[in-house]
């Protein structure tokens, strides 16, 4: 059974979509589950001003992606990489074993997005 938070964000995610001319586009696919998330970021003076995602996967992956995008606003990429999957999991309000893969996947995705952005500069 999913928490109310997971169901609400799965049915009506706030940050699902793409950003035209995004400064960073990073994709991560979980080998364990096959879930895939594509993260789009727009930055202004090295701060994240917009974050959106496209995902194929479980309600947990959709929910975790939506939460992560929300948490990224206003942060630098360095600050974003310091965000932990635990912070996402706390908001999801699910038993740890049920959500771990989704939040860990997103933590790795933010690190990948940071690497891509640094290569572009």
Kindly label every feature range from the protein language model:
Residues 1-121:
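Domain-level signature for proteins that mediate thiol-based redox and metal-cofactor handling
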